[in-house]
Design a protein with these regions (language model features):
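Structured C-terminal helix/loop/strand segments within mature extracytoplasmic catalytic/sensor domains
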Residues: 1-124
Length: 124
């Protein structure tokens, strides 16, 4: 399944979607898929980990994508150009109907600290 998805990540979620963008760049190192109602799951085969996230923010996957990007950024060894993609996904800009930036979403400092500690401890 991972090989098939790595060859055609577009088939998982479609153009420009979080799942597609991550798997296009990270290939078989990450398999992720959004579900209904803010559920996100991922397999990180190199780390021997599965990740399941459930967040109810009123916008189904928006906050879950931010958390999943932070998890991947912290736990998966990345190539030189990959941190920028994950940072853009873990800290998206919020714009109003006029296109004016009104804020950002981001993973909490507590989550980033916990992920950093896990990664540094070699628990992954």
């Amino acid at each position: 399944l991972r090989e098939a998805v790595a060859k055609a990540p577009f088939m998982v979620a479609g153009t420009g979607r979080f799942d597609t963008r991550v798997m296009e760049r990270l290939h078989e190192r990450v398999f992720c898929k959004v579900g209904a109602e803010g559920v996100y799951c991922a397999a990180l085969p190199g780390q021997g980990l599965g990740v399941a996230i459930k967040i109810d923010d009123g916008n189904n996957a928006r906050a879950a994508e931010v958390v999943m990007a932070a998890v991947i950024e912290a736990l998966v060894p990345l190539l030189a150009d990959e941190p920028a993609l994950l940072r853009s996904l873990s800290e998206p800009t919020l714009r109003n109907w006029n296109g004016i930036e009104v804020g950002r979403l981001r993973a909490s400092a507590a989550l980033r600290g916990a992920l950093s500690a896990q990664s540094a401890a070699g628990a992954v």
